[in-house]
Amino acid sequence: MLDREGYRPNVGIVLLNSRNEVFWGKRVGQHSWQFPQGGIQHGESPEQAMYRELHEEVGLLPEHVQIIGRTRDWLRYDVPEEYLRRQHATRVHRAAYRGQKQIWFLLRLVGLDSDIQLRASEHPEFDAWRWVPFWIQLDAVIGFKREVYELALSELARYLSRGVRMHQLAWGSPLDLLQSFYSKGEEGSPESSKTDKSK
């Protein structure tokens, strides 16, 4: 389902723990990390899509989380043509499809870490996860999504405590933060990552 401009409606999820750290998932078989996200199906509201994607990708139910806030409007990113070719998209789809437009939700985990299950669906999105600081360096995110991630985090930060917001002002852009985050262990497979133990 595309809009008139060729963007697919989508939701993104920033999941917080009690320390205001965020869920960071490693994509199956890849070295890239990202937040949970997924398309909005026909007839779904953004909130309904968010809960469905939350369960499919992270294994959490509505009772495991609290909605803190969401972005005011859609945030968009374009998918490069070369990426679409690698994904074997059809010519018709490539001609119409430009990228994603996303509503981002900020959630608080009120359940336990053990409630997170990466194999809740038949086609898992992630094979490892970890908690990371809110202003995570975005080098491990695929390039064309980084600007939207920065915009989403910057807008959602208004819902957090003053201390976390002031951290943004002190350090500047999230892209400049935590330069040594992936210096421990091999990049893309941090030693402290939590893997899916149900395999």
Swiss-Prot record:
Q: Name one GO cellular component term.
A: cytoplasm
> Domain named Nudix hydrolase: which ranges?
6-154
* This enzyme's EC code(s): 3.6.1.-
For biological process, the GO terms are: mRNA catabolic process
What InterPro entries does the annotation carry? Nudix_hydrolase (IPR020476), NUDIX_hydrolase-like_dom_sf (IPR015797), NUDIX_hydrolase_CS (IPR020084), NUDIX_hydrolase_dom (IPR000086), RppH (IPR022927)
Enzyme kind, highest EC tier = hydrolase
SUPFAM superfamilies, A to Z: Nudix
| Superkingdom assignment | Bacteria
Keywords associated with the record: Hydrolase
| One function term, GO molecular function aspect | mRNA 5'-diphosphatase activity
Q: Where is this motif: Nudix box?
A: 38-59
Which HAMAP family does this UniProt record tie to the protein?
A: Nudix_RppH
Question: NCBIfam families in the record, alphabetically?
Answer: PRK00714.1-2, PRK00714.1-4, PRK00714.1-5
Function of the protein:
Accelerates the degradation of transcripts by removing pyrophosphate from the 5'-end of triphosphorylated RNA, leading to a more labile monophosphorylated state that can stimulate subsequent ribonuclease cleavage.
Q: Can you say what this protein is called?
A: RNA pyrophosphohydrolase
Source species: Polynucleobacter asymbioticus (strain DSM 18221 / CIP 109841 / QLW-P1DMWA-1) (Polynucleobacter necessarius subsp. asymbioticus)
Gene for this chain: rppH
